[in-house]
Curated annotation (Swiss-Prot):
Function: Has bactericidal activity. May act as a ligand for C-C chemokine receptor CCR6. Positively regulates the sperm motility and bactericidal activity in a CCR6-dependent manner. Binds to CCR6 and triggers Ca2+ mobilization in the sperm which is important for its motility.
GO BP terms in the entry: antibacterial humoral response; antimicrobial humoral immune response mediated by antimicrobial peptide; calcium-mediated signaling; defense response to Gram-negative bacterium; defense response to Gram-positive bacterium; innate immune response; innate immune response in mucosa; positive regulation of flagellated sperm motility involved in capacitation
Location relative to the cell: Secreted; Membrane
Ranges in coiled-coil conformation: none
Predominant place of localization: secreted
Protein family according to the UniProt entry: Belongs to the beta-defensin family.
Assembly with partners or alone: Monomer. Homodimer.
Organism in which the protein naturally occurs: Pan troglodytes (Chimpanzee)
Protein name per Swiss-Prot or TrEMBL: Beta-defensin 1
A matching Pfam family: Defensin_beta
């Protein structure tokens, strides 16, 4: 009996997540902006980019700059 309640609860959670835009479900498999920056040879900085580097994007959800 507990198993059926658990399955029903899980199904309701998934359906409510899909109805609200599916941020959790669509976010699976996406790389973070920090990962993309560092893997392309950049570094994430909250301050200005060092000399001889330029801004290539953002990190931490737009709170920092990706300098390369």
């Amino acid at each position: 009996m507990r198993t059926s309640y658990l399955l029903l609860f899980t199904l309701c959670l998934l359906l409510s997540e899909m109805a609200s835009g599916g941020n959790f479900l669509t976010g699976l498999g996406h790389r973070s902006d920090h990962y993309n920056c560092v893997s392309s040879g950049g570094q994430c900085l909250y301050s200005a980019c060092p000399i001889f580097t330029k801004i290539q994007g953002t990190c931490y959800g737009g709170k920092a700059k990706c300098c390369k």
